[in-house]
């Protein structure tokens, strides 16, 4: 990071590094401390630029390489049937690269995001994560689920026996007896009795006069 007042970084090959693998090294003036990496390596394309991307639907991408000089800009345009979401023009502000990410293209008829999120590698050893696209439309609710399995039977209760009830009131006396019953039939003749005992001897007779 170049701090204001720390002196102008030295020019290297006219301020640009056009050969892949070439490294630019910065040092701070006396009394200042370097913040961030002191070396920037030119990898592919322009130093700090974004790669060319053309998905065939959204936008044409970059025509050529990203300008390497501070103050230069890149402008995007969408194809017929699409319109851009985000900044159409990106301007290089410092040696790190273009600010923000490329704009997305939205289909006029389908209202869906065409561009995908992408990760670009910065030439200073860090990774820039571009923002993801807008959220899509909610999906339709799924079918209603079937009934669940029957639950397990509950455990038996543990209540104690109830208190005995109080005695009931005395009942009323019953009515008097009913009508007299009919006369019973005659009984059977009993068996013959046994032989009687001999009688006592008679008294002596009296003499006649």
UniProtKB/Swiss-Prot annotation:
Keywords, in A-Z order: Collagen, Repeat
GO CC annotations on file: collagen trimer; extracellular matrix; extracellular space
InterPro entries in the cross-refs: Collagen_superfamily
Chain intervals with Gly residues compositional bias: 142-162
Residue ranges of the region described as Disordered: 138-209
Residue numbers spanned by region Triple-helical region: 130-209
Any GO BP: extracellular matrix organization
Ranges where the record places region Nonhelical region: 1-129
GO molecular function: extracellular matrix structural constituent conferring tensile strength
Superkingdom, taxonomy of origin: Eukaryota
Function as written in the Swiss-Prot or TrEMBL entry: Major component of the egg case wall which is secreted by the oviduct. The egg case combines mechanical strength and toughness with high permeability to small molecules and ions.
UniProt name for this protein: Egg case collagen
Taxonomy of the source species: Eukaryota, Metazoa, Chordata, Craniata, Vertebrata
């Amino acid at each position: 990071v170049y701090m204001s007042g720390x002196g102008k970084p030295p020019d290297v090959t006219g301020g640009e590094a056009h050969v892949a693998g070439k490294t630019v090294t910065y040092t701070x003036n006396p009394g200042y401390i370097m913040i961030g990496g002191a070396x920037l390596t030119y990898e592919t394309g322009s130093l700090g630029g974004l790669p060319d991307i053309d998905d065939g639907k959204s936008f044409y991408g970059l025509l050529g390489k990203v300008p390497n000089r501070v103050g230069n800009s890149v402008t995007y345009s969408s194809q017929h049937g699409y319109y851009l979401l985000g900044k159409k023009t990106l301007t290089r502000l410092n040696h790190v690269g273009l600010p923000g990410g490329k704009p997305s293209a939205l289909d006029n008829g389908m209202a869906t995001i065409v561009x995908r999120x992408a990760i670009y590698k910065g030439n200073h050893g860090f990774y820039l994560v571009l923002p993801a696209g807008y959220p899509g439309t909610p999906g339709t609710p799924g079918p209603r689920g079937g009934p669940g399995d029957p639950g397990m039977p509950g455990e038996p209760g543990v209540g104690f026996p109830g208190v005995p009830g109080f005695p009931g009131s005395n009942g009323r006396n019953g009515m008097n007896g009913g009508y007299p019953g009919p006369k019973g039939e005659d009984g059977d003749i009993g068996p013959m009795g046994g032989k009687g005992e001999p009688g006592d001897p008679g008294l002596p007779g009296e003499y006649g006069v």
